[in-house]
Amino acid sequence: MTVRVGINGFGRIGRNFYRALLAQQEHGIADVQVVAINDITDNSTLAYLLKFDSILGRLPHDVSLEEEDTIVVGSEKIKALAVREGPAALPWHAFGVDVVVESTGLFTNAAKAKGHLEAGAKKVIVSAPATDPDITIVFGVNDDKYDGSQNIISNASCTTNCLAPLAKVLHDQFGIVKGLMTTVHAYTQDQNLQDGPHSDLRRARAAALNVVPTSTGAAKAIGLVMPELKGKLDGYALRVPIPTGSVTDLTADLSKCVSVNEINAVFQDAAEGRLKGILKYVDAPIVSSDIVTDPHSSIFDSGLTKVIASQAKVVSWYDNEWGYSNRLVDLVGLVGKSL
C-alpha cells in the first residue's frame, strides 16, 4: 500500500524530507507519496526553494506551479495549502492523508499535534523532540517498540539520532556508567545571521561569525529511547559557522577497562551488521564537508577513539539535515506498514 503523506511546514526539514523521499524512490525503497503540503509562504517561493538549494544543489526534476495551488515535481502533483488556523483546520481527510509529517517546529506538543488526527490523518510524525508523544523513535535503537498502536510519534532530534546508536553500541558491549557529550553543530535558523535580540543570549550573536555554546536536549533524550541510560548522560552544543555537517563527541565511564581496538571492533561489527544503514564506520581522516549528504544517522570516526582505562571517548559525524530527513522517510515507511 502506498502511504499518502501530508507535510505541515515546508522549510529546511520539510524540503529535505521530500528530497530524501525522492532519492529513496529512485532506488525503489520508499512506497510513499506526498499528496499535500501546508505552508504560509507563497507557493512560487516554495517551488523555487525546492528547485534550488544552497547545500543540496538543483533538484534533478522539473518543478512548476499549476493553477497557483499545485506544485508539480516531474509527473507528481502536490496540493499546496496555506492554512494558518492550526492542524485541526487542515483538510487532510479530503486528500486521503495517512501520515502527517509535522515539521513547522510549532506543534511539537502532542496536544497540539493531535489536531492532525482530528483533521483526518491516521498518524502524526513530529520531526523534532516532542512533548508527551505516544513514543519517541530512533532507528537502530528502539524502532522495534513501534507496534502500530501509537498515533503521535516523535523522530527525536538529529543529534539524538547520531548519539543514540553511539551510546547503544558502547553500552551493550561495555556498559555505560555515566557520560558527557558535546555536539559541534552547524548553525540553524533559530540563530541570528547578525547580532540581534534572541531569548538565548548566546544565540543572539551572529551565527556565521562565532562559535556559539548553547543547550541540547539530545543527551537527556537518550533516556526516552534507552531507559537504562536515563539520567546517565548530559551535554551541550557548540554551534559553528558551517551550514550543515555536525559531529558528536561522547566521553563515557564504562563498567570495565577497554582498549581502542576493542571499541573500534564492536563499532565496525555493528555498522556491518545490525545497524547497517544507520551507523557507518570510517577509518579515513575525514572532515565535515566529507559527510554532507551522507544518509547515515551516525558516522563513526575510528581514528578519534581514545581510551584511558575504563574511560572512553568516541566520535560520530552526521549530516544534521540529510541524515535526519532520511530517518523521517524510514519512519513514515515503518508507520505506513501498520495502517
Curated annotation (Swiss-Prot):
Catalytic residues as annotated in Swiss-Prot or TrEMBL: C158
UniProt GO BP: glucose metabolic process; glycolytic process
Keyword Transmembrane helix listed: no
Alphabetical keyword list: Cytoplasm, Glycolysis, NAD, Nucleotide-binding, Oxidoreductase
Alphabetized Pfam families for the sequence: Gp_dh_C, Gp_dh_N
Enzyme class: oxidoreductase
Family named by the database record: Belongs to the glyceraldehyde-3-phosphate dehydrogenase family.
Protein name, entry field: Glyceraldehyde-3-phosphate dehydrogenase
Organism: Mycobacterium leprae (strain TN)
GN (gene name): gapA
